[in-house]
Amino acid sequence: MTSASAPPDLKAHGLSPEEYRQIQQQLGRDPNPTELAMFGVMWSEHCCYKNSRPLLKHFPTTGERVVVGPGENAGVVDLGDGDWLAFKIESHNHPSAVEPFQGAATGVGGILRDIFTLGARPIALLNSLRFGPLTDPRNRRLMARVVEGIAHYGNCVGVPTVGGEVAVDPCYSGNPLVNVMALGLLETPAVVKSAARGVGNPILYVGATTGRDGIRGASFASAELKEDAQQDRPAVQVGDPFLGKCLIEACLEAFATVAVVAAQDMGAAGITCSTAEMAAKGGVGIRFDLDRVPARESGMAAWEYLLSESQERMLLVVQKGREAEVMEIFHRWGLQASVAGEVIAEPLVEIWHQGSCVVRVPARALAEDTPVYVRPLLPEPPEYVQAAWQWDPSTLPPCDRQGIHLPQKTLAWEQVLLQLLASPTLASKAWIYRQYDHQVQNNTVLWPGQGDAAVIRIRSQKFGVGEVPPLQAARKAIAATLDGNGRWVYLDPYEGAKAAVAEAARNLSCVGADPLAITDNLNFGSPENPVVYWQLALACRGIAEACRALGTPVTGGNVSLYNEKGSQAIYPTPVIGMVGLIPDLKFICGQGWQQEGDLVYLLGSQAVTSLGGSEYLAAIYNKVTGRPAPVDLELEKRVQGACRHGIRQGWVRSAHDCSEGGLAVALAEACLSGGRGASVSLAPGSLPWDQALFGEGSSRILVSVDPAQRSPWEAYLESQLPGQWQLLGQVGGPADPLVLTTAEGDPLLSVSLAALQGAYYSAFAD
């Protein structure tokens, strides 16, 4: 093993001169080229979170249901009755920008490995997607290929894609966001951890062969996208969902033998990351021989083996003497399996290639003792925020109950509503989710578009061919959702991030679930930009506060920085993945009206709304300005609690979050989902008409209630939400329009279901 003799090209490794000096200090010498390549990927933002780690430590991470928190491959929560749920979110933003099909597909494959590596069988997938305007053919192609990639991997591997969200904004042009969340139920007696243990225990390489695909993928994901980003296509991994399915089954079968001491999937930074993290977490070392790694290409150098991110690969630490037993399982599933290393006492990562030791570095130097940057925080909001907060809604064209009076015409409220429903962010995503298999495994209770959150039956998937456990054995269910609003966070990072957590919990409450915990994906620009770092820091504060208030600890997540191209950064976009528990499947709710004559109520207050950052401002006036409404977390808890109680008492027949698009859009969505009209009167108040109809805010839920239950329902509301609920009207029939009037009965808008459908299903039409 020799040291580098010439000055290294630090830029190629994504390292600064100061970081190189830290490496020299930790090693007591210069790293050789192979070691330097390993440090380059392990010290990248994608792997070590050097800019975000100080901010993440403020998140609440413990709770009575938390079994596994941050630090493992995924978080785990206790659902009771011996059921444990693993869940996690990951991003594949940069790869999807340059190779959308494979970038998105391998994002699905990677998050599934995080789940089953713990010993959990994957039961559901969700995704959160952001694209630039679909009028641009490139953005439309990106979207189509991303959706195709997600559908391909999920459908082939046999895991249903049950929900998610899609937003469209110019800031995501050329820099799409592809965040994927997976859920799984534990099948092993205990969680399979990733810390290597037992000196002398063999290390098994299992799964697919290793090639040159995905080399330096972690470094690629830790830098800004270049204008000529297509040259980075070799950094994008290539997945095989059929092989991935075999890997799921082989791993779960191997874990059931209890011969596996530790497991780690090979994702970002491949063999480098897996060996370093397993050794560092266990306080031991790993000796690894690259000559024993099954390769799909000849002539690969040591650094290529180490940095390859070929998919569907795992490292296992196995009890000594039981390696043959475990390898036989993988061979039977048609997978590679070989003894490629062993656990050693000295806490080093020692890599051998062609009979020589090519790497010998402390495991902690690669995985734990990495750079950390605590950057100064702006003393006050940046200029763009201060300017936005000065915006006055009175500068908009005048409006009355007829509509908006523009210089050349009056835009009726019916036209405004239809224009909003046709905007890609609010429009139906049926064209997208129709491509996903959301029924495979036969546990999806609420399909995409039916409710504010996905609902998945809790039923063991451990059965033989031709054997299916009875449905009546499943009483409980899991609810899951993904939520984020980049515009709100751009205009107010602290309140916008709080609102994302609150909306996720609200969506779970709307289907009848108790919110349990979250996983978060922080999508931001370059932290080296003081404005972006300020956005990131305040968003983390907002998430932490909301999670504490709502009792939803953070069990893990992902940070994706440097989401920018040239001088154009995306909006700061934290995406919250939240899971909840439904104690009894008899008491769940969809978002659509159920019965003609049901009473329509609004829980919460219209006074908590704002036009700042609204879809109304963006779609009608092409403005992104103002200040989003602050989140009253105490009111949020009471509104959600009232909704859940009403569902479990059998009073509430439908429930729908009132957020993006405001009250008028929420009413239209309930009509569309239920196939029925409604007649509604706005409560008396002093709000301008545009804010009353389309203002956005938190802590509001639209529900429909059995009229026979009006008395106990309203008595309960008055005790729990005094003065903060309104009876708006009643549900109509399939032939009735959506009618909104003033409190005095004067007409505001009347739109037929056919017109609503024509607008709502137009944005993503085939």
UniProtKB/Swiss-Prot annotation:
Primary localization: cytoplasm
Residues reported to bind ATP: 49, 88, 520, 557
Source organism (scientific name): Synechococcus sp. (strain JA-3-3Ab)
Gene that specifies this protein: purL
Annotated protein name in UniProt: Phosphoribosylformylglycinamidine synthase subunit PurL
Keyword set, alphabetical order: ATP-binding, Cytoplasm, Ligase, Magnesium, Metal-binding, Nucleotide-binding, Purine biosynthesis
InterPro entries named in the record: PRibForGlyAmidine_synth_PurL, PurL_linker, PurM-like_C_dom, PurM-like_C_sf, PurM-like_N, PurM-like_N_sf
Quaternary organization: Monomer. Part of the FGAM synthase complex composed of 1 PurL, 1 PurQ and 2 PurS subunits.
Positions bound to substrate: 91-94, 113, 237, 309-311, 560
Positions annotated to bind Mg(2+) 1: 90, 558
GO biological process terms held by the UniProt record: 'de novo' IMP biosynthetic process
Family indicated by similarity: Belongs to the FGAMS family.
Pathway given in the UniProt record: Purine metabolism; IMP biosynthesis via de novo pathway; 5-amino-1-(5-phospho-D-ribosyl)imidazole from N(2)-formyl-N(1)-(5-phospho-D-ribosyl)glycinamide: step 1/2
